[in-house]
A protein has these predicted regions:
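Charge-dense, low-complexity intrinsically disordered regions
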Residues: 145-318
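Residues immediately within or flanking Cys/His clusters that coordinate Zn2+
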Residues: 22-25, 38, 57
Length: 318
């Protein structure tokens, strides 16, 4: 149904790499040398999600400044995952929730060991259930986190996809490119759907990547382009809709690809990373709202000291 037409994979701590055409902005078209900064000015993937090595040569300073608002919204949307996973952004591992709010997640390192600090002031919202002969502890941790603008977060994903989309396809995505220039604009009159999945909460895999998929058969009732972006323990997928290519495709589509990738082992070979079945979000709105997860449930075995987090999605009426 789909074929890969572009992809980039970044390992945390690798060598610097650059994509795009130097001194020609693929987003606004400027080619004035004075409009561009250093080679490392524009991150192809958000720095807040852990990217320190992949940079875009074809992104001018003006566009980079605009896009930073979108990327900030995306990081706020998945803030708990970044904190729990220990993902280091521009200023280290982000704190989820503001000091003084009802719940705060903090990541700390002490003598090379990671620690998660949880502050919760509404203690009645935290409960635990002991099961399996007092071996299994289940702890529900409510999370307020930060508010984000859903449309901005969506446009951060759109920008990532357009950074990798082959230039020959741009003629079909002019509206997508143009909407990035106006902060509140949408790429079209349709729901801005996002498929979200997760893996390894609490220990983010040190990898980021984006894959651009193109429909094989033009008559299939599926989007012409789907972009899948993975960042540590989180994975997103969006459809890049084209008025020309997607006339026969419904506005509301389910983004339900179950994604698996591989992480290289130091000794050779690869370790598979399997993401969950995608949760469907509509990120069309311009009103700020709390990040999409109201709580994380920690299941912890007191004897083996092993545990796992399960995210609990926030109700749509919250």
């Amino acid at each position: 149904m789909y074929k890969v037409i572009a992809q980039e994979l970044v390992g945390i701590g690798g060598d610097q790499r650059f994509i795009g055409e130097a001194r020609k902005c693929r987003f606004c078209g400027t080619s004035d040398p004075s409009d561009f900064g250093k080679k490392t000015n524009a991150h192809a993937f958000p720095e807040g999600l852990g990217n320190k090595t992949l940079f875009s040569l074809g992104e001018c300073c003006s566009c980079n400044s605009k896009f930073s608002r979108y990327e900030d919204a995306l990081c706020k949307a998945v803030g708990p995952y970044l904190t729990l996973g220990g993902v280091k952004g521009k200023n280290g591992v982000r704190q989820t929730g503001r000091s003084g709010s009802s719940s705060v997640l903090k990541h700390e390192e002490n003598q090379g060991k990671r620690h998660i600090q949880i502050e919760a002031r509404n203690i009645e919202d935290i409960h635990s259930v002991i099961k399996n002969n007092n071996e299994l502890l289940r702890l529900r941790i409510p999370i307020d986190g930060d508010k984000f603008v859903p449309r901005y977060a969506y446009k951060a994903l759109l920008k990532i996809a357009l950074s990798l989309l082959p230039v020959k396809e741009f003629c079909s995505y002019r509206q997508n490119l143009e909407c990035l220039q106006e902060i509140d604009d949408a790429p079209g009159d349709y729901p801005l759907q996002v498929g979200f999945s997760y893996a390894w909460i609490g220990n983010a895999p040190p990898t980021l990547g984006c894959v651009i998929l193109q429909r094989n058969n033009d008559t299939d009732p599926v989007p012409y382009i789907i972009a899948i972006f993975q960042a540590g323990s989180v994975c997103f997928q969006i459809a890049l809709r084209s008025e020309e290519k997607d006339r026969h495709v419904q506005n509301a589509v389910s983004l339900s690809i179950v994604w698996t990738t591989q992480l290289a082992k130091p000794e050779g070979d690869f370790f598979p990373i399997e993401y969950s079945s995608p949760i469907q979000f509509d990120w069309s709105g311009l009103n700020p709202q709390l990040q999409p997860f109201e709580a994380f449930e920690l299941t912890f075995n007191a004897h083996t000291t092993q545990g796992a987090y399960l995210p609990l999605a926030r109700r749509t009426d919250q």
